[in-house]
Amino acid sequence: WVDVVLGYDSLAEYEQNDGYLGAVVGRVCNRIAGAEFELDGNRYPLYQNDGVNHLHGGKRGFDKYVWAVEELPDGLRLTRTSPDGEEGYPGTMRASVTYRVDGVSLRLDYEAESDRDTLCNLTNHSYFNLNGGGSALGHTLQVFADAVTERTPGLIPTGVLAPVAGTKFDFSAPKPLCRDLPGTDAGSLHTDGYDDNFCLSGTGLREAAVLTGDRSGIIMTVLTTTPGMQ
């Protein structure tokens, strides 16, 4: 077998985890421009932890807490209660993530309930290396997308959809991740990489991407119903 998901060996390492390895991210994953939002006529300032923006729930988002654990016959359920005003968000929110083994599949189900209108966009932040270790830049990737969301230097969308044809974002045909990244190769450990939203083709449940480990031959296929993938 090959361990294809990055992780740490101790709880202490996870508590100092600045890369969100394997974390439940919330209340809202990704960035909120200017670290504020308006809801029901009220303005809510949030913690600025990514320049002037708010990222992955703030300074102490859901990833920085040890959740309560309930053992199930076929898995486990994690729960925590986020109090009103945590990181600037309104409402007391009770969130749960249930992990279940279904045959050869691991299923994650997210639920959240708040006593006030609020924002909620939970995700899992796992990192995959299909070789089981070393650089992943030699992995071959295909993405079924015609455009990416243009972004500012602060990684905030501008609203413009930029065609991928002829750019480094063109993964319409499978290619190594490192092919169009200047100064990188399959042996590199550091790169600016890709941190962009791909606007996926089609609608409904469909293939979004196919990733292949260059040394292991392991293939991961990503399916989604969403319009984009980052």
Predicted segment positions?
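An exposed, glycine/acidic-rich loop-and-rim segment of catalytic or binding clefts
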Residues: 1-230
